[in-house]
Amino acid sequence: MGSIAITTGNFENEVLQSPVPVLLDFWAPWCGPCKMIGPVIDQIAGEYSDQLKVGKINIDEEPALAEKHGIVSIPTLLVYKDGSLAAQKAGAAPKHDIINLFKNLL
């Protein structure tokens, strides 16, 4: 399973009620660093598909979600587990750093 688009409409069901941890990528199509880590996020979605849900939130299309989560720079990665925020990282990061955000929650 690849990444899914997270919206205000599906946030509660896909993130807060998820039985597995959820890695959220707040991004925008005009963001250079977002374009750099986008393929890495997609790789992680494929490699951890049985243990982790990966969602992408386009801040241009979902400004209310970005504001609710206090997103001030992108990319920003958040990890939710059992309906609560468990980890976060702002800025582009190498794959191993992204994996370390959620590895101990699996």
Sequence positions of predicted segments:
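Conserved helix-turn-beta segment immediately C-terminal to the redox Cys motif
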Residues: 19-21, 38-57
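Conserved redox-active cysteine motifs that mediate thiol-disulfide chemistry
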Residues: 26-40
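Non-catalytic, surface beta->alpha helical segment in thiol-disulfide oxidoreductase systems
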Residues: 78-106
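A short beta-strand-turn-helix
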Residues: 3-22
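Short pre-active-site segment immediately N-terminal to redox-active cysteine/selenocysteine motifs
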Residues: 19-20, 26-30, 73
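Conserved Rossmann-like nucleotide-binding pocket used by diverse enzymes
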Residues: 2, 7, 27, 53-55
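Structural microenvironment flanking redox-active thiols in thiol-disulfide oxidoreductases
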Residues: 59-65
